[in-house]
Design a protein with these regions (language model features):
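Short hydrophobic alpha-helices that are characteristic scaffold elements of the AMP-binding
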Residues: 3-9, 30-31, 152, 161
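Conserved sugar-transfer catalytic core signal across GT-A, GT-B, and GT-C glycosyltransferases
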Residues: 2, 104, 157-159
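Conserved structural elements of the adenylate-forming
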Residues: 86, 99, 118-140, 144-150, ...
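Conserved S/T- and glycine-rich ATP-binding loop of Class I adenylate-forming
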Residues: 6, 37, 102, 108-111, ...
Length: 161
């Protein structure tokens, strides 16, 4: 849900390895162009060090506190986002925008040095889903998260996936 919320707000998701050192986190933040961080409470110390190194203000850190986890003193819970009001999510329904709009920046394992960023578009994720999960071919082409339905016959963006 977090990834979809980030995309819906017009952002680009990136995730890190919880065992990263502050230096590795700093590299990840710079390479991914991260502006905000949502972190588990257990790894706040290396996150703070990387944020200081990369110039991300502490006000841009939210703690992902679920179940019985607590937010460290002086920090904000990710749940503060719920009090920010509501806005419609970013939408587009054309193939070109889907192919050119970044959805995530994922990283290689870094076998020859530090991990390298790879930008995946919305179209990349749709293609991956089609390859993995859509064994039976649909009678229509899917090219975005919003697509006309075969039953509508109007070519309008009337059904969300």
């Amino acid at each position: 849900m977090l990834v979809l919320a980030i995309n819906g707000a017009g952002g680009v998701y990136t995730g890190t390895n919880p065992s990263y050192t502050p230096m590795e986190l700093g590299h990840h933040i710079r390479a991914s162009h991260a502006k905000f961080i949502i972190s588990e409470p257990e790894i706040i110390a290396p996150i703070h060090a990387a944020m200081k190194e990369t110039g991300i203000p502490e006000s841009n850190l939210l703690v992902f506190d679920v179940l019985s986890q607590t937010v460290p003193a002086g920090l904000k819970s990710w749940q503060t986002l719920f009090s920010a009001g509501e806005e419609d999510w970013v939408r587009f329904d054309d193939l070109k925008t889907c192919e050119e709009t970044a959805a995530a920046r994922l990283f290689s394992s870094g076998t020859t040095g530090l991990p390298k960023a790879t930008t995946l578009t919305h179209r990349n994720f749709i293609a991956q889903h089609e390859l993995v999960f859509e064994i039976e071919k649909r009678p229509y082409q899917v090219f975005s998260l919003t697509q006309s339905t075969p039953s509508s016959g109007k070519g309008d963006a009337s059904e969300s996936y």
